[in-house]
Every structure is written in C-alpha cells, then in structure tokens.
Amino acid sequence: MKKCLFTGVATALATPFNENGVNVDEFKKFIKFQISSGIDALVVCGTTGEASTMTKDEKITAIKCAVETARENTSSKKVPIIVGTGSNNTSTAIEMSILAEKLGADG
C-alpha cells in the first residue's frame, strides 16, 4: 500500500509578483508564515498560484523557492511541497512533472 504524502491541511499558495517576475523575497516570507502557522503541506503553481499564466522560468523560480524555503524549516516536521504541473498539453505536463521532481518537490 502506498504511503500518504501528508495528512492534515495544505495551503494552495498564491504567487507574489513584482515587475521582474516572481517576488522571491515576499514568497519566502509567505511560505515561512505558513510553516510557522502549522500548515501540513504547500501547493505551488496550482490554479491559485497563477500557473496557467506563468512562464516556465517563473514556475521554476517558484518551485525552487518553495522547496529551498521549506527545507530551511527548523522544526522537526517536514512540510511537503506539491506542485501543480497540469497543462492542456500532455507533453508539457509530463515535462513539468519530471522537472518538479528534479527540483525537489514531493508530489
């Protein structure tokens, strides 16, 4: 039987932007706030995170930021990062799923 990725509550994160793309500093603050508030998992680049309008580079930036920030978490609880990789193009969805895994996403 497969083990569950997480139990509890996951936040579907909105992705903050500035004139240069993903606002990494604000995104890190938002992720740290979620973790310190006790969230069990984080969803990055889902429909709440504007994934359908993000470029591939913006998605990569958001995924890297989330994975790195969650791994900096000093509590004993690991916060899984789940990435929305859906697309209306099957090959793009597969490519993004493989890329998300390579970048350290959990699901």
Describe the predicted segments one by one.
Residues 2-11, 15-107:
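Active-site beta->alpha loop and helix N-cap motifs at the rims of alpha/beta catalytic domains
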